[in-house]
UniProtKB/Swiss-Prot annotation:
Keywords: ATP-binding, Isoprene biosynthesis, Kinase, Nucleotide-binding, Transferase
Ligand binding (ATP): P101, V102, A103, G104, G105, M106, A107, G108, G109, S110, A111
Superkingdom, natural source: Bacteria
This protein's name: 4-diphosphocytidyl-2-C-methyl-D-erythritol kinase
Gene (UniProt): ispE
E.C. no: 2.7.1.148
Family: Belongs to the GHMP kinase family. IspE subfamily.
Catalytic activity: 4-CDP-2-C-methyl-D-erythritol + ATP = 4-CDP-2-C-methyl-D-erythritol 2-phosphate + ADP + H(+)
Pfam families xref list: GHMP_kinases_C, GHMP_kinases_N
Active-site residues, Swiss-Prot/TrEMBL: K16, D143
One GO BP annotation of this record: isopentenyl diphosphate biosynthetic process, methylerythritol 4-phosphate pathway
Length: 311
């Protein structure tokens, strides 16, 4: 019998923007109750998994130096989790190519974890169902299940309980990446502090926004975007106000802080408008860099041939 070394499995996973993010009270488990509408965007990370002598993580791309390559990285935890489940050692090399901003509120770490689950499921020929992968994803982090599924979805609980949403058409976004990241726990704590002082108002339900998604009309969707964490992100980084104003002044239909920030996401009427807005924002000096993206797109998907087995 000829034993063929499995080829690396390469997986692409999308970033996300929260079109609606309503943050409830702090729960007994230390998390906040969330009601959110996610949309997966074309700005993505690529993760390659390959057999190795021991578990290792490498990262390249913008801000790669600040991404941990030890057990604090979700991809490491994903590998150990699947290895324990399948009764094997997690002897794989995980290579991450970052396209999603680090600490930008766009679920880059969650995307990498989802990609690792998908990649190792193929590499190790585990034949886990999507539902089984969902269970592992929810244990890894609140945004990991959505990174698996992609598209547009309502998330409840910590954001891990998902219900797909019909979203007609493609929406066009400009993403303004900030010079310095924001820690998600810090932003939630700041929101708790602001609320203890009596501010700010809370978002209602996302029903109108979900209806707007079914129309496929960006102009209808734009005024319905909302994020309870935005006030906290602006409190921690007041310069984001300039970024939001500049994007709308450049022609965006609306601007919003993405998740816990500090990335600002601008919804545009069409692809050409997104290119124009990105050019103006890039020259305005209000952010580190800009990216153009579209959504919804699929969740974590293998983009090369699946691993070959032993023959």
């Amino acid at each position: 019998m000829l034993s063929v070394v499995p080829r690396p499995v390469v997986v692409r996973a999308p970033s996300k923007v929260n079109l609606h993010l309503a943050v409830g009270d702090l729960r007994d488990d230390g998390y906040h109750e969330l009601n959110t509408v996610f949309q997966a965007l074309s700005l993505s990370d690529t993760v390659s998994v390959a057999p190795a002598e021991t578990l290792s993580v490498t990262v390249r791309g913008e801000d790669a130096r600040v991404v941990p390559t030890d057990s604090s990285n979700l991809v490491w935890q994903a590998a150990e989790m699947l290895a324990a489940e399948s009764g094997r050692r997690p002897d794989v090399e995980i290579a991450i190519d970052k396209g999603i901003p680090v600490a930008g509120g766009m679920a880059g770490g969650s995307a990498d974890a989802a990609a690792t689950l998908v990649g190792l499921n193929a590499l190790w020929q585990l034949d886990l169902s999507r539902e089984e992968l969902d269970g592992f994803a929810a244990k890894l982090g609140s945004d990991v299940p959505f990174s698996l599924h992609g598209g547009t979805a309502v998330g409840t609980g910590r954001g891990e309980r998902l219900l797909p949403v019909l979203s007609r058409s493609t929406f066009h976004w400009v993403l303004a990446l900030a010079k310095v990241g924001l820690s998600t726990p810090t932003v939630f704590r700041e929101l708790d502090r602001l609320r203890a002082d009596g501010n700010p108002p809370r978002l209602g339900g996302p029903e109108d926004l979900m209806h707007a998604l079914t129309t496929g009309d960006a102009a209808t969707l734009a005024p319905l975007l909302g994020n309870d964490l935005q006030s906290a992100a602006l409190s921690l980084n007041p310069g984001l106000r300039r970024t939001l104003r500049a994007g709308v002044a450049a022609g965006a239909l609306a601007g919003i802080v993405s998740g816990s920030g500090p990335t600002c996401a601008f919804l545009c009427a069409e692809a050409d408008a997104a290119v124009r807005v990105s050019a103006e924002l890039a020259g305005a000096g209000v952010c580190r860099t800009v990216r153009v993206a579209s959504g919804p797109v699929p969740g974590a998907r293998i983009i090369n041939d699946a691993a070959e087995g032993s023959h």
